[in-house]
Curated annotation (Swiss-Prot):
Record-level GO BP terms: adenine salvage; AMP salvage; purine ribonucleoside salvage
Compartments where found: Cytoplasm
Keyword Transmembrane helix tagged: no
NCBIfam families: apt, PRK02304.1-2, PRK02304.1-3, PRK02304.1-5
This protein's pathway: Purine metabolism; AMP biosynthesis via salvage pathway; AMP from adenine: step 1/1
Taxonomic lineage of the native organism: Bacteria, Bacillati, Bacillota, Clostridia, Eubacteriales
Name this polypeptide is given: Adenine phosphoribosyltransferase
Xref: InterPro entries: Ade_phspho_trans, PRibTrfase_dom, PRTase-like, UPRTase/APRTase
Organism annotation: Clostridium acetobutylicum (strain ATCC 824 / DSM 792 / JCM 1419 / IAM 19013 / LMG 5710 / NBRC 13948 / NRRL B-527 / VKM B-1787 / 2291 / W)
UniProt superkingdom: Bacteria
EC number: 2.4.2.7
PANTHER family: ADENINE PHOSPHORIBOSYLTRANSFERASE
CDD domains assigned: PRTases_typeI
The protein's role, per its UniProt record: Catalyzes a salvage reaction resulting in the formation of AMP, that is energically less costly than de novo synthesis.
Length: 172
């Protein structure tokens, strides 16, 4: 299945010069959505994953069903102030400024095997920050999986030696 057929590309969004890859059309297509979840699940099935960790918001769309498929728990990573209990946080750079991601402090136990799942890998800043949160709590990042990868932005380079996979690659 060619997932690009199910991903809407919007030039000039959110600003001029950007070509936005919209996965909402993919999740509307039940075959493409199931295929995406199944393929990521197949990639992770032999990695003994305890937990899937996914950043808000679109990471939840793929991370939670993958966790269910492989029999793992699911941990949401949220923007600052959205989680009710004690958290750990990491600040990361955006194109214009900074943002903060948080995870509950008790979300991961030392030694748990974690896969990070998100809709898109661009510069790698978000996923690198999520990996730092996982490792700060003693988890081991065993894979980072994406539906879409924007290869020209070299996000994989920022992820170092992490085992990564993506279902669709675009040159921006």
């Amino acid at each position: 299945m060619d997932l690009k057929d199910s991903i809407r590309v919007i030039d000039g969004f959110p600003k001029e010069g950007i070509s936005f890859k919209d996965v909402t059309t993919l999740i509307q297509d039940k075959e493409a959505y199931k295929y995406s979840v199944d393929k990521i699940g197949e990639y992770l099935k032999d990695k003994n994953v305890d937990l899937i960790v996914a950043p808000e918001a679109r990471g939840f769309l793929f991370g939670a069903p993958v966790a269910y498929k492989i029999g793992a728990g699911f941990i949401p990573v949220r923007k600052k102030g959205k989680l009710p209990c004690e958290t750990v946080e990491v600040t990361y750079e955006l194109e214009y400024g900074e943002d903060i991601l948080e995870m509950h402090k008790d979300a991961i136990k030392k030694g748990q095997r974690v896969a990070i799942v998100d809709d898109l890998l661009a510069t790698g800043g978000t996923i690198n920050s999520v990996a730092k949160l996982v490792e700060a709590l003693g988890g081991e990042v065993v894979a980072a999986c994406f539906v879409v990868e924007l290869t020209d932005l070299n996000g994989k380079d920022k992820l170092g030696d992490y085992d990564t996979m993506s279902l669709v690659k675009y040159n921006v």
